[in-house]
Amino acid sequence: MAEAEYFIWIAPEGDFEEEFGNITRMLPTGEYFSPCKRVPMTNRQAVVVFYALVFLLSLLGNSLVMLVILYRRRTRSVTDVYVLNLAIADLLFSLTLPFLAVSKWKGWIFGTPLCKMVSLLKEVNFFSGILLLACISVDRYLAIVHATRTLTRKRYLVKFVCMGTWGLSLVLSLPFAIFRQAYKPYRSGTVCYEVLGEATADLRITLRGLSHIFGFLLPLFIMLVCYGLTLRTLFKAHMRQKRRAMWVIFAVVLVFLLCCLPYNLVLLSDTLLGAHLIQDTCERRNNIDQALYITEILGFSHSCLNPVIYAFVGQSFRHEFLKILANLVHKEVLTHHSASFRTSLTTIY
């Protein structure tokens, strides 16, 4: 194999996390590199604050979504099971944000085991998110276009579908965790990064390609086809009630695409660059790195947006949440009156 071409310049101050946080190609480890000066990423303080805000909103919002769905056990639908799994995925991802925020500020100080764990949770969240949305699109298509309660509508089978989705997400995410480790490049701070040699570079490109196909392009195609056919049926049959019920799902899918599609398109360009299918130049590399930096932040924000959609678009969610809140207040009032009554009896007798 021909030697890999490197257009990399290490900043003298050694701020690797800021300069190279989103590079996905193989890193050189020697002292001399091709002189390609990188444009530094700025506003790290703002990024850290943003991560902290997303973490808090995601933790609170997704916990409430899980509470509402678990509370309505008797009336829980198939779609609710998928939404519950979406909330779990976003909640797990939010747990990685404190580590990512610290790494933006101080570099990776948590060692290789946590580097692998955080990378795994981050990737599993993304893959499981889009795969679960694809499952929801198929479920809605079968329920509305074919107007049937097939075997896929049975709750026990849906649980197996969700388990399969998590399993596939784990398989697609494993390469990212396997290759990542706490790495200290020449004249730079430690970073959680994929350390690859020349022998594994082609394997990594292949794995990235498979991830793009099975973890993004194929589920996206399934969603577009299923929702296209579902929308056509809804408008032809004038199903107003079902059309209103679909707005929440459409909003969830739309927000997911707006947040995650830009990052994946840039990541696909980065993969093509690493595979030498498009010419690697300093200007192109810098443009892709900056685009990855920005679109990744946009993608992270998705983990806290679904609960907002359920709250403002989903009438059923608001009703159930207010019902839970009313029950809690009612129990608190009863407990207070009961305690007051016991105190009065004790005082009298």
From Swiss-Prot:
One of its GO terms (biological process) is neutrophil chemotaxis. InterPro entries: CCR1-9-like (IPR050119), Chemokine_CXCR_1/2 (IPR000174), GPCR_Rhodpsn (IPR000276), GPCR_Rhodpsn_7TM (IPR017452). GO terms for molecular function: C-C chemokine binding; C-C chemokine receptor activity; interleukin-8 binding; interleukin-8 receptor activity. It comes from Rattus norvegicus (Rat). It is found in: Cell membrane. It is a multi-pass membrane protein. Interacts with IL8. Interacts with GNAI2. The chain crosses the membrane at residues 45-71, 81-101, 117-138, 160-179, 205-225, 248-269, 291-313. Signal peptide: none annotated. The keyword Membrane applies. Pfam families: 7tm_1. Keywords: Cell membrane, Chemotaxis, Disulfide bond, G-protein coupled receptor, Glycoprotein, Membrane, Receptor, Transducer, Transmembrane, Transmembrane helix. One of its GO terms (cellular component) is external side of plasma membrane. Its main location: membrane. This is C-X-C chemokine receptor type 1. It comes from the Eukaryota. Residues 1-44, 102-116, 180-204, 270-290 are extracellular. The gene is Cxcr1. Disulfide bonds join C115-C192. Glycans are attached at N22. SUPFAM superfamilies: Family A G protein-coupled receptor-like. Belongs to the G-protein coupled receptor 1 family. Residues 72-80, 139-159, 226-247, 314-349 are cytoplasmic. Receptor to interleukin-8, which is a powerful neutrophils chemotactic factor. Binding of IL-8 to the receptor causes activation of neutrophils. This response is mediated via a G-protein that activates a phosphatidylinositol-calcium second messenger system.
